[in-house]
């Protein structure tokens, strides 16, 4: 019988780090799900520990404070949004096709929510728009990144001859407002919200674009 493999201290440390990173990602993802329904202010280390069947001290070791947990939830939700909305759109050509894909993906994300409370971005911004601090800063940075992406593709679309004469920021603002409103209306049971938003977006971008 061969001797058992002896792990070095460095290997043991690496495994612990990997296990810790996986645990942190799992908890952060659940925190984002909970926050999508109950808000980021409703998060607690104890609540998440109970939901996931782990010790509160273990969660505290990974995150330290409620604010760190909130920030991790924001980052996890951002990654989900990128995976479902932004990244697939990058398979489309730059400009109007990609802009269309970004908005279509977001509407699908709203129509068939990945998180139980619908679009985390919409809920989080509404909750923290008047609460200065690191969490608001993280949400604002995410929003700024999203607007920058929309404006970039709007600019490219204009180079292709679409939406001439429109201010890219103003158009991005309109598109964002439409889908955000559709998310809220859809959560309130308005079945016309998504098709209404799609029709208005077609009018803004040009039905044949």
Name each model feature, range by range.
Residues 23-26, 30, 34-68, 72:
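Helix-turn-helix
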Residues 82, 97-101, 133-159, 173:
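Amphipathic alpha-helical packing segments from all-alpha helical-bundle domains
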Residues 98, 113-134:
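Amphipathic alpha-helical segments used for helix-helix packing
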Residues 20, 168-175, 193-197:
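Short amphipathic alpha-helix in the helical subdomain of ABC transporter nucleotide-binding domains
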Residues 1-22, 164-166:
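N-terminal intrinsically disordered/low-complexity leader segments
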Residues 109, 156, 175-192, 204-209:
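Amphipathic C-terminal alpha-helical segment
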Residues 72, 86-117, 170-175:
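Hydrophobic alpha-helical connector segments
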Residues 76-81:
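Short, basic, alpha-helical segments at the C-terminal edge of helix-turn-helix-like DNA-binding modules
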């Amino acid at each position: 019988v061969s001797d058992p493999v002896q792990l070095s201290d460095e290997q043991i440390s690496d495994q612990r780090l990997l296990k810790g990173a996986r645990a942190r990602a799992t908890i952060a993802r659940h925190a984002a799900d909970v926050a999508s329904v109950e808000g980021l202010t409703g998060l607690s280390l104890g609540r998440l520990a109970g939901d996931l069947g782990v010790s509160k001290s273990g969660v505290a070791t990974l995150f330290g404070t409620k604010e760190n947990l909130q920030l991790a939830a924001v980052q996890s939700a951002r990654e989900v949004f990128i995976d479902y909305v932004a990244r697939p759109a990058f398979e489309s050509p730059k400009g109007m096709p990609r802009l269309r894909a970004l908005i279509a993906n977001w509407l699908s994300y709203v129509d068939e929510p990945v998180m139980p409370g619908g679009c985390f971005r919409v809920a989080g911004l509404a909750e923290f728009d008047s609460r200065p601090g690191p969490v608001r800063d993280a949400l604002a940075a995410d929003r700024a990144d999203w607007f920058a992406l929309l404006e970039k593709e709007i600019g490219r679309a204009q180079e292709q001859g679409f939406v001439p004469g429109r201010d890219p920021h103003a158009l991005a603002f309109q598109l964002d407002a439409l889908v955000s409103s559709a998310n809220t209306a859809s959560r309130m049971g308005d079945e016309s919200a998504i098709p209404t938003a799609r029709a208005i977006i077609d009018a803004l971008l040009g039905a044949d674009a």
